[in-house]
Curated annotation (Swiss-Prot):
Residues 6-35 are annotated as: Interaction with MDM2. Residues 206-240 are annotated as: Interaction with TP53. GO terms for molecular function: protein-macromolecule adaptor activity. GO terms for biological process: negative regulation of signal transduction by p53 class mediator. This is MORN repeat-containing protein 3. MORN repeats lie at residues 38-60, 62-84, 91-113, 114-136, 137-159, 160-182, 184-205. Keywords: Cytoplasmic vesicle, Repeat. Pfam families: MORN.
Length: 240
């Protein structure tokens, strides 16, 4: 008795097209309608793994890690230089959920850059900022501004060590006027020194010392006087 074989079912044409359109693994350039394109690895139709994304309108280029369609891991972002037109690196570091997160270096200009911690694409944690005028800030950051304990070293060598809040000197701190050989220690509010003591400090090595040294003034209880003045100031601030 002859045995009949069932004909093998062929794949529907639309299923074949859909299967071939699915992006998985390494792919060459995949273009978007607006001209943006991506070269790299895919998983389940989204960018995942190593890859390079180019944004046509801005000229921005990201090279690095991707997870489920977002920049995640280590990567470098480059933008066109407004003067030369050539791409220059503006950020190298870690990303999470398409935002700068973890340790990274951000270049704001040829002589101005930040190296340190990031959270949600904002400077947050510990970091060091090199300003174009030669000043350097090193310390804690929050919401893209110095906040917490930190030191600002000015180009001329003078420096402030102490508390910061919202990008300004706020709280207890010391300012070393090394150019004049003096040290101020006291309390600041929004970059203004409100109360404290000034003494000579390194006056013999100062390039421009004051004409006369600060005379020694003896108070029976200098710490108590300063504490009382500080308490009065804080009370006034609370009343306002």
């Amino acid at each position: 008795m002859p045995v009949s074989k069932c004909p093998k079912k062929s794949e529907s044409l639309w299923k074949g097209w859909d299967r071939k359109a699915q992006r998985n693994g390494l792919r060459s350039q995949v273009y978007a309608v607006n001209g943006d394109y991506y070269v790299g690895e895919w998983k389940d139709n989204v960018k995942h793994g190593k890859g390079t994304q180019v944004w046509k309108k801005k000229g921005a280029i990201y090279e690095g890690d991707w997870k489920f369609g977002k920049r995640d891991g280590y990567g470098t972002l480059s933008l066109p230089d407004q003067q030369t037109g050539k791409c220059r690196r503006v950020y190298s570091g870690w990303w999470k959920g398409d935002k700068k997160s973890g340790y990274g270096i951000q270049f704001f200009g040829p002589k101005e850059y930040y190296e340190g911690d990031w959270c949600g694409s904002q400077r947050s944690g510990w970091g060091r900022m090199y300003y174009s005028n030669g000043d350097i800030y090193e310390g804690q950051w929050e919401n893209d501004k110095p906040n917490g304990e930190g030191m600002l070293r000015l180009k001329n060598g003078n420096r402030y060590e102490g508390c910061w809040e919202r990008g300004m000197k706020n709280g207890a701190g010391r300012f070393f006027h090394l150019d004049h050989g003096q040290l101020f220690e006291g309390f600041w509010v929004d970059n203004m020194a409100k109360c404290g003591t000034m003494i000579d400090f390194g006056r013999d090595e100062a390039p421009e010392p004051t004409q006369f040294p600060i005379p020694e003034v003896k108070i029976l209880d200098p710490d108590g006087v300063l504490a009382e003045a500080l308490a009065m100031f804080r009370k006034t601030e609370e009343g306002d």
